Regions:
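Short, surface-exposed, charged amphipathic helix/loop patches that serve as local interaction elements
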Residues: 1-225
C-alpha cells in the first residue's frame, strides 16, 4: 500500500521518508509474530519491530530517524486497511459523554500541521525551540531512569531542541528547563496543543457522535479489543 506521511516535508533531502508516496508492504503472519512477541511487548519494542518490517530496505536502515507521528500514522493506516474502521470490544464500554453502552465503535484519526513550522516560543524572557520527536528519541526516553520520577521535565528535555533565558549565563538545557516557572509551563502546554504537529486517534460514539481519545498499543490490531 502507498501512504502519504503527514510529516514528509520535514525530513532532510535524501531521506527515504521525504516522499508523498511512501510504500508500506502488506503485513504477513511473520509480521504478526513480531507484533505479538511477549518479550518485545514487555520491553516496549513490538510496535517498532512490526513497523520496521513493513518498510522498504533503506527506510528500515534509517527507521530511527522516522518521526513518531509518521510511525503512528503507518500503524493506523495498516490497521484500517487490514480490518476496516470498526472496532469491536470484548466487553461493552461506556461513552464518557452520553453514558451509552458501546459494543463497537468507528475509529477515526486527525492530523494537525500548523502553518508556522518554526516551532518557536518566546515568552517570559525565554526563547524555546521545539523539535519533532523520532523513533530513536522515544527509545532513549524509554530507557531514561528519570522519566518515572520527573516525567514532565524529562519529556520537555526531549521535545525541546534549544532553550535560552534572557540575562542568564546558564547553558545546561536541563537546568534551564527545571527553572521554568509554572506559569510558563502552562504556556508551553498550550503551545504544544495548538502550534505543534499532532496525530490523534479516536473512536466515535454511535449514539451521540462524540469522539473519545483512543490509545494505540499492540491490541490495536486485534479484531476485538
Amino acid at each position: 500500500m502507498v501512504v502519504k506521511l503527514p510529516l514528509h516535508d520535514f525530513y532532510p533531502e535524501g531521506s527515504p521518508f521525504k516522499t508523498e508516496n511512501f510504500t508500506v508492504k502488506d503485513p504477513t503472519i511473520e509480521d504478526e509474530d513480531r507484533l505479538f512477541n511477549p518479550d518485545r511487548i514487555k520491553g516496549g519494542y513490538a510496535l517498532d519491530d512490526f513497523v520496521r518490517g513493513l518498510l522498504p530496505e533503506e527506510a528500515q536502515r534509517q527507521y530511527g530517524n522516522m518521526f513518531l507521528i509518521d510511525r503512528n500514522f503507518i500503524l493506523y493506516a495498516v490497521r484500517v486497511a487490514m480490518f476496516g474502521d470498526t472496532i469491536e470490544f470484548r466487553e461493552n464500554i461506556e461513552c464518557s459523554h452520553c453514558g451509552a453502552s458501546l459494543r463497537e465503535a468507528t475509529i477515526d484519526s486527525e492530523v494537525f500541521i500548523p502553518e508556522n513550522r518554526k516551532f518557536e516560543l518566546k515568552e517570559g524572557g525565554y526563547f524555546i525551540r521545539f523539535k519533532l520527536l523520532t523513533v530513536s528519541d522515544q527509545n532513549v526516553m524509554r530507557k531514561d531512569p528519570l522519566m518515572k520520577s520527573n516525567f514532565l521535565t524529562r519529556t520537555l528535555y526531549y521535545v525541546i531542541d534549544t532553550i535560552e533565558k534572557e540575562g542568564s549565563d546558564i547553558t545546561d538545557k536541563y537546568a534551564l528547563i527545571r527553572s521554568i516557572p509554572i506559569s510558563l509551563g502552562t504556556k508551553i502546554r498550550e503551545f504544544l496543543n495548538t502550534q505543534y504537529p499532532r496525530f490523534d486517534i479516536f473512536i466515535k460514539c454511535g449514539s451521540c457522535e462524540s469522539t473519545i481519545p483512543f490509545e494505540m498499543n499492540e491490541s490495536f490490531f486485534w479484531n476485538k479489543l
